[in-house]
């Protein structure tokens, strides 16, 4: 099956199916949200141009959709953003502007520009059409693996996980959806646990998880549908990167490797069960890969 590759953990686990967001076919996983949103924008909104803040993945989605529909796109990224992701956004025609030292600082700048210039701001979380678009890949998971027991998803802002939850719980409510976030950027986890929006420092090296503020719409969906939510360490994420490369020959970035790190936390609970890991991207810099291979 081109959607999944079977793999066993510790020789004791059930079949694992890493759904790849870094292969040519599955790369569209991270693009669907932006495409669905821009496709349904009015002509007036498109004429204004779009602006977004991103550490890379959301920005690529917006840039791709903007190019597809001939819309001007401005993407605010923090200084130190993944060079590969920045280059990808620029190659897609987006105007990339470096602002601030974190995603949230870049986001605040983008929101200010929206007020000043009238752009259509595309929020990375509080966009129903974005969440709906991202969630479509869960349809493919359920079609390809009708007997799946659980799906592990990475969570930064939570839009991807919210999309998966929405689809899975509507069609196959018995399937568990487990969210995984870095303990070095726990805003979404803390918000889910405390049932209120909270902020927390985002110090993770996994830029796809580096969100310091939770968002209202994804949190509302996650509180209703997410079966579990765990935090993993930076070391566990790096270890998962190496495992995926060594055993699956998949190059996963930190956010993409987080689901495996989460499963290893809970492996005794999932022995003998069919589990899907959403590998949400393979945009790993050479320095990040070197650090993972060095174990530091």
Region spans (language model):
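PLP-dependent amino-acid enzyme catalytic core
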Residues: 1-296
């Amino acid at each position: 099956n081109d959607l999944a590759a079977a793999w066993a953990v510790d020789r004791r686990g059930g079949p694992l199916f890493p759904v790849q967001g870094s292969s040519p076919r599955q790369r569209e996983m991270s693009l669907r949200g932006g495409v669905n949103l821009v496709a349904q924008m009015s002509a007036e909104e498109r004429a204004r141009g779009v602006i977004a803040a991103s550490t890379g993945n959301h920005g690529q989605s917006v840039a791709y959709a903007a190019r597809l529909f001939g819309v001007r796109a401005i993407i605010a990224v923090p200084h130190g953003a993944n060079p590969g992701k920045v280059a990808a956004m620029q190659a897609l025609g987006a105007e990339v502007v470096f602002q601030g030292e974190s995603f949230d600082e870049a986001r605040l700048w983008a929101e200010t520009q929206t007020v000043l210039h009238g752009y259509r701001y595309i929020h990375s979380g509080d966009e129903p059409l974005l969440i709906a678009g991202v969630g479509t890949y869960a349809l493919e998971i359920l079609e390809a693996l009708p007997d799946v027991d659980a799906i592990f998803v990475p969570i930064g802002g939570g839009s991807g996980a919210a999309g998966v939850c929405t689809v899975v719980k509507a069609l196959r409510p018995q399937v568990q959806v487990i969210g995984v976030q870095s303990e070095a950027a726990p805003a979404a986890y803390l918000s889910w646990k405390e049932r209120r929006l909270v902020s927390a420092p985002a110090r993770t090296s996994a830029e796809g998880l580096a969100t310091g503020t939770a968002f209202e719409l994804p949190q509302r969906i996650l509180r209703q549908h997410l079966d579990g939510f765990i935090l993993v360490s930076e070391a566990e994420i790096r270890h998962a990167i190496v495992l995926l490369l060594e055993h699956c020959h998949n190059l996963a970035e930190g956010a993409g490797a987080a689901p495996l790190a989460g499963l290893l936390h809970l492996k005794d609970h999932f022995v003998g069960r069919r589990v899907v890991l959403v590998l949400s991207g393979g945009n790993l810099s050479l320095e990040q890969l070197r650090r993972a291979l060095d174990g530091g």
